[in-house]
Amino acid sequence: NRMGDKPDPDAVLSMTVCDPAMGSGAFLVEATRQLSDKLLEAWAAYPDKDPCKKLGADDRVFVAMRMVAQRCIYGVDRTPAAVDLAKMSMWLLTISKDHPFTFMDHSMKHGDALVGMSKEQIRKFHWDLSKGGSILPELRTLDREVEEAVQARLMLRNLDADRTLELEVTLAEADRKMMKAKQAGDLLVYIWFSQDRPKARNETRDRYTDKFTEALQPGSIERKEINEIRFAPKPLAPFHWDLEFPEVFACGGFTAFVGNPPFAGKNNVSKGNIRNYLDYLTSLVTPEASGRADLVGHFFYKAYGLIKPTGSLSLIATKTVRQGDTRESSLSLIVKKGGVIYDAKRRVAWPGKAAVVISVISITKLSLISLDIITSLIV
């Protein structure tokens, strides 16, 4: 328990937990329950920081859950219907019938957790930071815009869910600050996927530096195609983590990742996604990965890169995550970067009727145990 035996309420509410493929939000619902229990304990230990002293026990529970949901819980999914379902799950959990269904809009978002550009890639308008040239004039104010968005989104965390109009206005302002940068990131991803070879991608990118502003106009062909393909059967739905949740990365990253990311072998990844998707994963998400690695391995590697130096992740995977190409392309790479596998359940029967054997792997950036133990866990 990194918060200590008696964390104060501020410590509990400073935690950020994310599911990168949240589906219906089941893992985030459970995370909300557990963190709200911790928050109630913290209020009991620090009564001077308890905002609900006059409320009954049941009301205190629901206030705690709403505060945790609004401040600590984040989720992403590339299926729009799943995002709506997850929001509904949180809405029902917190008994927020008096609040709009959109009270989690700021932290539960549509997009592909594996596809997107960092702030630095967008600033240089290049996926390869070693090749990016001078910053485009249109992106020179990016740092200021991100900082302004951070401040607006921090206000969201502290606004009561009852203040519906103020929440909507503040979120709209934060989104407006990020709009140009997000559109630049979307365009960069669009350029990358539009070509099959590195040389053609670089040449196309160079052409767009001369017509950058034109390509971002609402009526441009590029904007139209980017918006259409975002919701296609095989979508390209970029998610630029630095820009979507800037307040999280202003604090170094997420406290934790949880979830059950999708499993898919090489052939299914290629068949089930837009052209060049597998190439993107092995070029930009996990550059040292084998093209034969299971999709779940890329989620492990991506999540590890998004947690703070004291953060951790615990994800469900198939047994392939500890075997062959998938292990070498995820767990082994994470360990080489200093990650510590502090718990590994190697063979767990999936509850219910499905004949599936899963692994549950928990990793932290903190140095807790020896490499000998790590090796024994992943073999």
Please give the residue ranges for each predicted region.
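Short, mixed-charge aromatic SLiMs
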Residues: 11, 53-58, 110-111, 115, ...
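Conserved SAM-binding motif I beta-strand of class I
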Residues: 74-76
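Class I S-adenosyl-L-methionine
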Residues: 1-61, 82, 222-223, 227, ...
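Short, flexible turn/loop "capping" segments at secondary-structure junctions
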Residues: 65-68
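Signature of N6-adenine DNA methyltransferases within the class I
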Residues: 29, 36, 78-145, 158, ...
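Coupling/switch/interface segments within P-loop NTPase motor domains and analogous charged loops
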Residues: 128-253
